[in-house]
A protein has these predicted regions:
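Primarily recognizes the serine-hydrolase "nucleophile elbow" in alpha/beta-hydrolase
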Residues: 154-158, 162-208
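An N-terminal hydrophobic leader/cap segment in hydrolases
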Residues: 26, 30, 35-77
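Mobile cap/lid helix-loop segments that gate and shape the active-site cleft of serine hydrolases
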Residues: 197-230
């Protein structure tokens, strides 16, 4: 009888040990899977960041643009030999020129239509495609993109005094617009749906990842603001799901000057501000 009790007790101990071992094994497997998922997410962010940030459409070099307003096609070569393509719209007896940096998707086939707004307000317009967009070619890097923005500004500067230059940036283009405005002295800077930095946006979306060490395209727009001396107009919609309103407000608040204005568009999204009266009336007044 005693031997039977001893055997039963031993069996219970063995079963308990097996359960503990199985639990440890399951926990180990779970941790292993979670670490692999975490590593995979880090890898996706690091290796595919260009695909997440830039959404270009490519055009053949033979593509013929068709626009409502008359234009010339401009081609520049960067310091590293990249081919850069832009459209230059000219208005007779213009008041000046709008240098326009567009958003992160599409190409000049679509973005060229935006020139009509400014041409109707008696401005010339120069709008370009970034590397890998439309007919523009070349290896991307944050440094190259800022250098390209500078090259386009210098092109405009050959034909206009800075008092006649309006720099306009939209979405990702706001960081390039702020960059050239900080290095030069245009008449005015207009930022539509701007962001504090790409790093700040990425952190807000992937707060559980070491984004600072993964992101090459940090685009620190805020770093340029203190060197800007011209008036700056900010436009941002409260329903912007791509670049949240608080990103634009944070950039606005970081700009220590009395030559700034924030136009908040209630219910405005990321791609429809030009359909709101607050935007169109303000643009006409500013230009």
């Amino acid at each position: 009888m005693q031997q039977s009790i001893w055997v039963n007790g031993l069996n219970r101990k063995i079963k308990l040990q097996i359960r503990k071992m199985n639990l440890k094994k399951k926990l180990f497997i779970l941790v292993f899977i979670l670490l692999n998922i975490y590593g995979l997410l880090c890898g996706v962010i690091y290796f595919f960041q260009e695909n997440l940030i830039f959404m270009p459409s490519v055009l053949s070099q033979e593509h013929v643009f068709e626009m409502k307003s008359s234009f010339d096609e401009i081609n520049l070569k960067s310091s590293d030999g990249a081919h850069l393509n832009g459209l230059y719209f000219k208005k007779e007896n213009s008041k000046g020129v709008v240098l326009y940096f567009h958003g992160n998707a599409g190409n000049l086939k679509d973005w060229g239509q935006i020139a009509d707004l400014f041409v109707d307000l008696d401005y010339d317009v120069l709008i370009m495609d970034y590397r890998g967009y439309g007919k523009s070619k070349g290896e991307k890097s944050m440094e190259f993109l800022y250098e390209d923005a500078e090259l386009w500004y210098e092109f405009v500067q050959q034909n206009y005094s800075e008092s006649k230059i309006i720099v306009y940036g939209r979405s990702i283009g706001t960081t390039f617009a702020a960059y050239v405005a900080a290095k030069h002295g245009p008449n005015k800077l207009i930022l539509e749906a701007p962001f504090y930095s790409m790093l700040a946006i990425a952190k807000s979306r992937f707060s559980f990842l070491p984004i600072r060490y993964l992101l090459d395209y940090k685009f620190p727009t805020y770093q340029f603001m203190d060197d800007i001396n011209c008036p700056v107009i900010f436009y941002h919609g409260t329903y912007d799901k791509v670049i949240p309103y608080d990103q634009g407000k944070k950039l606005y608040d970081s700009f220590n000057t009395d030559k700034k204005e924030l136009i908040t568009i209630p219910m405005g999204g990321h791609n429809n501000l030009n359909s709101f009266k607050e935007y169109t009336e303000s643009i006409r007044l500013e230009l």
